[in-house]
Structures are given as C-alpha cells and as structure tokens.
UniProtKB/Swiss-Prot annotation:
Pfam families per record: Ribosomal_L32p
Record-stated family: Belongs to the bacterial ribosomal protein bL32 family.
GO cellular component terms, semicolon-separated: large ribosomal subunit
Record region (Disordered): 1-38
Official protein name in the record: Large ribosomal subunit protein bL32
C-alpha cells in the first residue's frame, strides 16, 4: 500500500481541487414554438424539441 512521504501542503490541495468547482449553466436555448428556455439538445418541459412535439402526455 502506498504511503505518502510528506504531508501535502494547503497549496497543493487547492491546486488539485481547482477543477472541482461547479459552473453555472450558461448555454440555454429558446424553443422555436413555445418560446420556453431549455438545455441544448434536450426537450422542453412541454415535450417540444426543435419546434416539434415529440412527447405526448
């Protein structure tokens, strides 16, 4: 089993964790038909995708 030789510093710990932060969703699209905002390449809550109804409830 590997055992560290020296204690990692706060700086090294911070550098390792620098990519762990969550980013805000910035790329929201507007549906052509309903005008509703949605994630890119996802359907809207109404069931529309690229202006067409793809899911019926």
């Amino acid at each position: 089993m590997a055992v560290q030789q020296n204690k990692p510093t706060r700086s090294k710990r911070g550098m390792r964790r620098s990519h762990d932060a969550l980013t805000a969703v910035t790329s929201l699209s507007v549906d052509q038909t309903s005008g509703e905002k949605h994630l890119r390449h996802h359907i809207t809550a109404d069931g529309f995708y690229r202006g067409r109804k793809v899911i019926t409830k």
